[in-house]
């Protein structure tokens, strides 16, 4: 007598939490790309043809290697159409300096798509932000090229000598000496005014300079409910509080935290990188814990670490902690009673 076989279930129900959104993946990706348009336009305005070159190299590289990775891994679905590869390439480009050689930008696109996403099984299965994986590998492989910053075209014409092409970022200048904020500090005169820092008229990565463009795009995503406001707000607030306390203890002016908020990749990281749907926590409380952790790590690296920028590595480190946050900070299941 043959054993009775159970029929295959018609519906498979995965473990909670369950989330639903009226937007498709491709439409969501297009919305994020649209939100990045102001930052892209600002980068082209300040860095001209080099900005276009780096963006094109990164986006095309991401698309090509997405196609190749799918073929190698036997993925039949054409994931190029969902826009995730193009978005990864664009985000990567906005985290790179305008002077980066084209072949390095192409390699960055490959690293982001293949190592950051494909080897984990594709979109939705990656544990790290793909664009920051690409940036981190490029920084480790080509540190000199990744830390060579071009002065914006709006300033280059009025600058002579070697400084007309390269310059230190405000974060690097602040780290030159502990006395930079004190009267007569050796590097104090090299710091750009806050107005230049705010509008992006400084050296830096393509999309890390113009604060209004990034905030505008971020607010658009919050309005469209594509990202949760808690992550950027608590991330930025944590950095502001920690750098403010540190500045007060060290006797620095009250503008010290503003320099940290406006400089480097904090704005693009807070609105576009840390809010990645796949690599950030699901619950509201989890997002707050995640964002505060990002702020703590970013401030620690910037203030006391050997590297002047801490956004990229902070996000990658908190990406690793995200599964643990989701595990211990969960919503109570319907009908499951109170959480113990």
Task: Tell what function each PLM region has.
Residues 130-215:
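Long hydrophobic alpha-helical segments that form multi-pass transmembrane helix bundles
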Residues 127-132, 257-264, 287, 305-318:
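Loop-to-transmembrane alpha-helix initiation sites
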Residues 232-234, 241-284:
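A beta-strand-loop signature enriched in Asp, Gly, Thr, and Trp
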Residues 91-96, 100-160:
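Membrane-interface helix-loop-helix junctions at boundaries between adjacent transmembrane segments
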Residues 49-61, 99-108, 197, 201-211, ...:
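Structural signature of hydrophobic alpha-helical transmembrane segments
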Residues 1-63, 338:
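N-terminal signal-anchor module of multipass membrane proteins
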Residues 64-76, 113-125, 216-225, 271-280:
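C-terminal ends of transmembrane helices
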Residues 31-39, 54-66, 84-89, 93, ...:
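Alpha-helical transmembrane segments in multi-pass membrane proteins
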